[in-house]
Amino acid sequence: MNRETFDIQPIGRFYGSNTAIRRPREIACFSYDDQHKFHLGDSSLRYYYPPQLPADLNRGFDTFQKLDDAADEHIDALLDTIAAMEKETGKRCEADIITWRGMMTKILTAPFDDMNGFEMNATCFQGTMCKQLQRQQRMPPGMASQDLMAYWGYKFETISVLDKTWDEASREEIEGRENLVVNNNAQYCSVVRTGIGRTKLVLGGEVDAIWDSKPERKEDPINWVELKTSAEIRKDWDMVKFERKLLKFWAQSFLLGVPKIVVGFRDQGGILRRLEELETANIPNRVRKSGRGTWDGNICINFAATFLEWLKSVIKEGGTWRLRKAEKSSVIEVYQVEESGTGDILSQAFLSWRSTT
C-alpha cells in the first residue's frame, strides 16, 4: 500500500515567505430549502439585519427543526452545480482541487490545531483532485446543555437575517424574527474559484447572509457576512479562548472571500448581550498584536500552499486515497485505499456528464 507522510512541525519553516493568493470569486451557487432539498440558484439567500438586544437565544428550542445530518451527501451538490455551470457556459471548470470549504479549513488551521484530527477521502479524475470528509462514527446525542449551546448559534442566525432586503421588509417581519421557528435545513451555498500558491481551488461552502445585495458584475466582490456566537470575555483566559476561536472564524471566511464576521457575545445563560463586527482581513493582525501568539495567519497560508503542492505530487490519476491526521498528531498521512476507480467520491451523474465532454 502506497503511504506518504507530511510533517506539520516545525512550523517555523513556513514563516516569512509571502504566498500568492487568488481572491475568491463566486462562479456559481446553490440552495437547500426548508426540507433540505437541493436547488440551483440563490433561493435561500438571506440578508443581514442586526437583531434587537438583549435577545434570549434559548427561545424556541423545543420547536427546533434540526437538520438530519445522518445522510452523507458527499460532494454531490457541489458537483451537480459545477456540471450545470459547465453545461450553461460550454466550458470545463478547471481546478487542481474541488472540495468543500470545511475540508480546506481543516488543512489551513492544522499548524495551530494540535488537538483535533481529520480523515478525508480523495480521488484524482481528469487531472482534478476531489476531496470529501470521511464519514466519522456517529456520536451519541450530546448532553442537553451541548445541544442547547449549538442551538444558540442557529437562533442567532435566525434573528439576524431577513429573506428580503431591509427596505423591502415590513416592521412586523423585522421585529417578529425572535418568534420564528428555527430551521437549519435551509442553506445558501457559494461556489468560488480561488487559489493558494500554485494550487487552483474550487470550493463550496455555506454563507450565512449578505450585507446589502449581490453586485451586477460577477467580477465584483460580494459583501457576505458570517454570523458567529461566543461567550462574553470577562478575563484573560476568555480572551485566549476567543483568539483560538478566531482562527477557525478567519479561515472559514478567508477561504470563501467573506469580508465581514459579526460575532454575537452571549452570557452563560444564553442571553445575547452585544455585537461586534470584525473585518476578516484584519483578524490575523489583531491576534498578532495581542502578543499571545496563539496563531499566525501567514504561517497557515504558507503551510497550506506547501502541503497542497506536495499532495498533488502524491495523489495521481486513478484509485482512491485517504488523508488522515490523528488527534494530537503533527503528521498528515496519505495512503491509497483503492488502486482503481473513484470510490463513492464522484457521483455517477458527474462521471457520466464528464465522459461526454
Swiss-Prot record:
The biological process GO terms on file are: cleavage in ITS2 between 5.8S rRNA and LSU-rRNA of tricistronic rRNA transcript (SSU-rRNA, 5.8S rRNA, LSU-rRNA); deadenylation-independent decapping of nuclear-transcribed mRNA; mRNA processing; NAD-cap decapping; nuclear polyadenylation-dependent rRNA catabolic process; nuclear-transcribed mRNA catabolic process; positive regulation of termination of RNA polymerase II transcription; termination of RNA polymerase II transcription, poly(A)-coupled
Chain positions recorded as substrate binding sites:
189, 206, 228, 252
Source superkingdom = Eukaryota
Species annotation: Emericella nidulans (strain FGSC A4 / ATCC 38163 / CBS 112.46 / NRRL 194 / M139)
- Cofactor names: a divalent metal cation
Q: Which GO terms describe its molecular function?
A: 5'-hydroxyl dinucleotide hydrolase activity; enzyme regulator activity; GDP binding; metal ion binding; mRNA 5'-diphosphatase activity; phosphodiesterase decapping endonuclease activity; RNA binding; RNA NAD+-cap (NAD+-forming) hydrolase activity
Cellular compartments per GO CC:
cytosol; Las1 complex; nucleus; RNA polymerase II termination complex
Family statement: Belongs to the DXO/Dom3Z family.
- Where is this protein chiefly located? nucleus
Return the InterPro entries for the record.
RAI1, RAI1-like_fam
- Where found? Nucleus
Q: What is this protein called?
A: Decapping nuclease RAI1
Q: What does the subunit section of this Swiss-Prot or TrEMBL entry state?
A: Interacts with rat1; the interaction is direct, stabilizes rat1 protein structure and stimulates its exoribonuclease activity. The interaction also stimulates rai1 pyrophosphohydrolase activity, probably by recruiting it to mRNA substrates.
Tell me how the cofactor is bound.
Divalent metal cation.
Q: Which reaction does it catalyse?
A: a 5'-end NAD(+)-phospho-ribonucleoside in mRNA + H2O = a 5'-end phospho-ribonucleoside in mRNA + NAD(+) + H(+); a 5'-end (N(7)-methyl 5'-triphosphoguanosine)-ribonucleoside-ribonucleotide in mRNA + H2O = a (N(7)-methyl 5'-triphosphoguanosine)-nucleoside + a 5'-end phospho-ribonucleoside in mRNA + H(+); a 5'-end triphospho-ribonucleoside in mRNA + H2O = a 5'-end phospho-ribonucleoside in mRNA + diphosphate + H(+)
Q: What is its EC number?
A: 3.6.1.-
Q: Which UniProt keywords apply?
A: Hydrolase, Metal-binding, mRNA processing, Nuclease, Nucleotide-binding, Nucleus, RNA-binding
Q: Where does a divalent metal cation bind?
A: 157, 208, 226-227
- Protein's job: Decapping enzyme for NAD-capped RNAs: specifically hydrolyzes the nicotinamide adenine dinucleotide (NAD) cap from a subset of RNAs by removing the entire NAD moiety from the 5'-end of an NAD-capped RNA. The NAD-cap is present at the 5'-end of some RNAs and snoRNAs. In contrast to the canonical 5'-end N7 methylguanosine (m7G) cap, the NAD cap promotes mRNA decay. Also acts as a non-canonical decapping enzyme that removes the entire cap structure of m7G capped or incompletely capped RNAs.
